[in-house]
Amino acid sequence: MQKTFESKTATSKAVVVFSGGQDSTTCLIQALTQYDEVHGITFDYGQRHREEIEVAKSLAKRLKITSHKVMDVTLLNELAISALTRDAIPVSHELMENGLPNTFVPGRNILFLTLAGIYAYQLGAEAIITGVCETDFSGYPDCRNDFVKAMESALVQGMDKQLKIITPLMWLNKAQTWALADKYQQLDLVRHHTLTCYNGVIGDGCGDCPACHLRKRGLDDYLQNKAAVMAELDASEPKA
């Protein structure tokens, strides 16, 4: 999926898979500069850090997006056992025997992108935007570019509609993602008003879970090397 940084695209409507975290909020901010209509969709799957739903609602209002839908998909909680769906399972820094982190929720992005695709179909939108990333790989197979391409193909063939899944962060590291927020003058908003923490702490988070470690490492790198990281981001933009 090609990253896009132009001020406008040919597609006037986009659906953003929006959790209220750093990555999806950064994608939402960028989308507002590129599309005439930006529709957010947030999923309630009984997640451990379900405070993110209220954060997403607040940010959607603050950023004045076209519409924001919160969808109940708590059935996923019944089917997928994970540290993110069971409070009794502590978030671990170690990988499980199958090589995946215990925060992996099987089928989550398959379900999210399928439902976002149906929503985009009804809205007449031609793009779904999601903040998945392969560069700072967290071990989630459903964040890989190959998976996204496969999902896009399935949606196009299954609904007989031209639909793009756009992944602006796919090849950016976390420092470059912070730079992207700063590029749109929204670094402070993303830093202090998003929720990435698996333990549900807004802003800089608990400081202990894997999500907080990755977020902090990227922020520290960006703040210490702003010019260099911004130059890397600019170099990654597609040339006209």
Curated annotation (Swiss-Prot):
Pathway assignment: Purine metabolism; 7-cyano-7-deazaguanine biosynthesis
E.C. designation(s): 6.3.4.20
Enzyme class: ligase
GO BP terms: queuosine biosynthetic process
Cofactor binding note of this UniProt entry: Binds 1 zinc ion per subunit.
Keywords from the named record: ATP-binding, Ligase, Metal-binding, Nucleotide-binding, Queuosine biosynthesis, Zinc
Residue sites binding ATP per the record: 18-28
GO molecular function: ATP binding; ligase activity, forming carbon-nitrogen bonds; zinc ion binding
UniProt catalytic activity: 7-carboxy-7-deazaguanine + NH4(+) + ATP = 7-cyano-7-deazaguanine + ADP + phosphate + H2O + H(+)
CDD domains (UniProt xref): QueC-like
Cofactor: Zn(2+)
UniProt-annotated binding residues for Zn(2+): 197, 206, 209, 212
Annotated InterPro entries: QueC, Rossmann-like_a/b/a_fold
Function: Catalyzes the ATP-dependent conversion of 7-carboxy-7-deazaguanine (CDG) to 7-cyano-7-deazaguanine (preQ(0)).
Family stated for the protein in its record: Belongs to the QueC family.
UniProt protein name: 7-cyano-7-deazaguanine synthase
Species in which this protein is naturally found: Shewanella sp. (strain W3-18-1)
Biological classification of the source: Bacteria, Pseudomonadati, Pseudomonadota, Gammaproteobacteria, Alteromonadales
Gene name for this UniProt entry: queC
